[in-house]
Amino acid sequence: MSTFIGQLFGFAVIVYLVWRFIVPVVGRLMSARQDTVRQQLADAAAAADRLAEASQAHTKALEDAKSEAHRVVEEARTDAERIAEQLEAQADVEAERIKMQGARQVDLIRAQLTRQLRLELGHESVRQARELVRNHVADQAQQSATVDRFLDQLDAMAPATADVDYPLLAKMRSASRRALTSLVDWFGTMAQDLDHQGLTTLAGELVSVARLLDREAVVTRYLTVPAEDATPRIRLIERLVSGKVGAPTLEVLRTAVSKRWSANSDLIDAIEHVSRQALLELAERAGQVDEVEDQLFRFSRILDVQPRLAILLGDCAVPAEGRVRLLRKVLERADSTVNPVVVALLSHTVELLRGQAVEEAVLFLAEVAVARRGEIVAQVGAAAELSDAQRTRLTEVLSRIYGHPVTVQLHIDAALLGGLSIAVGDEVIDGTLSSRLAAAEARLPD
């Protein structure tokens, strides 16, 4: 019995403990769980509502999308049709432009081909004509006939006047021209009293003084001061050269500095010119003027075809004495004997180049020699040597045209083919066959 009561008491204690401590906790847990379930049910209901709303929104969005897609498709179709029309119109315009451009290009190509054909035909015609002319003038008689025909044409030309003047005068202004003319006239009278040795010495001394004045620019400037009283200038030249030159040379220098010169260099040119006149006076007394002129022109042509020799003789960096030695060696090796007057004239010219090209200076010297006799120099180009009759006739015709004696300097150039080319000063009469062929070729279309 006591066992039963003890167990009952223990059970009662357990029940009490469960009711007192466990039941409240479990109750609270159950209540919290119920609240959680109720909240989840509420959330589920809200989610169901949102799902329904989303479904409705989706359905509406699909309908809106279909409507928008239909609208976009319609707009795209309309734009495509409009673009297609624009492209078609643009294609028509472009096709028309290309067609017109193609037509213009065809016309241009046709014109170019036509012009090229004409040009080639013209060049071929000129080439054939040149070949025919070359074959024709291969016969010396036919080539000589071309010269005769040109002389006939030249003979029919209207006369023209030409003044024979010292070439140096063309380089000077009026004051120097008057001074040089007066000096040369005075020297012509004064030279009659000088013998061969006197003229030779005079020429050499004048060249030495000219070289001195070329080096002493200040002295030259004082000697050409344009003052009315020439006494100071005469005294200066006397102090400068007295005892160094002979009396004739000193007299020439006194006369030269007493003149009025337009430029300082004109005085030096005048002194050099008088020295040349002294040597040419020697040639004239010996009856060798023609030989001197011919040798001077021949040496001028040698310089034209030997540019290296011209460069060596005209190199002012080399002392004048060295260039003169070279000149004399060249002249000593010449096939024929060179006239001593020519040697002296060329030597003096090389000494007094003063920056001028030697070939130009020698040609100028030859023209001075010709002008001394009152003659005109005619530079004549021919394809072959002229006969004596043709040369005589040419000289007579040119003398009649220009109203003065003419000296003919002949230059042979086979490239001229036929006819003659004549240059008198700045005037050129070109009647060569080569020039006519060149003129025909120049008239061809570009």
Curated annotation (Swiss-Prot):
Ranges that cross the membrane: 4-24
Principal location listed in the UniProt entry: membrane
Keyword Transport tagged: yes
Keyword set, alphabetical order: ATP synthesis, Cell membrane, CF(0), CF(1), Hydrogen ion transport, Ion transport, Membrane, Multifunctional enzyme, Transmembrane, Transmembrane helix, Transport
Source superkingdom: Bacteria
GO molecular function, one term: proton-transporting ATP synthase activity, rotational mechanism
SUPFAM superfamilies found in the cross-reference section: F1F0 ATP synthase subunit B, membrane domain (SSF81573)
Region of interest called ATP synthase subunit delta, as start-end residue ranges on this chain: 169-446
Listed InterPro entries: ATP_synth_B-like_membr_sf, ATP_synth_b/b'su_bac/chlpt, ATP_synth_F0_bsu_bac, ATP_synth_OSCP/delta_N_sf, ATPase_OSCP/dsu
GO cellular component terms, A-Z: plasma membrane; proton-transporting ATP synthase complex
Subcellular location: Cell membrane
Membrane topology field: Single-pass membrane protein
Residue ranges of the region described as ATP synthase subunit b: 1-168
Entry similarity comment: In the N-terminal section; belongs to the ATPase B chain family. In the C-terminal section; belongs to the ATPase delta chain family.
Summary of subunit composition and partner proteins: F-type ATPases have 2 components, F(1) - the catalytic core - and F(0) - the membrane proton channel. F(1) has five subunits: alpha(3), beta(3), gamma(1), delta(1), epsilon(1). F(0) has three main subunits: a(1), b(2) and c(10-14). The alpha and beta chains form an alternating ring which encloses part of the gamma chain. F(1) is attached to F(0) by a central stalk formed by the gamma and epsilon chains, while a peripheral stalk is formed by the delta and b chains.
NCBIfam families hit by this protein: ATP_synt_b (TIGR01144), ATP_synt_delta (TIGR01145), PRK13428.1 (NF009961), PRK13430.1 (NF009967)
Annotated function: F(1)F(0) ATP synthase produces ATP from ADP in the presence of a proton or sodium gradient. F-type ATPases consist of two structural domains, F(1) containing the extramembraneous catalytic core and F(0) containing the membrane proton channel, linked together by a central stalk and a peripheral stalk. During catalysis, ATP synthesis in the catalytic domain of F(1) is coupled via a rotary mechanism of the central stalk subunits to proton translocation.
Protein name: ATP synthase subunit b-delta
Taxonomic source organism: Mycobacterium tuberculosis (strain CDC 1551 / Oshkosh)
Primary gene name: atpFH
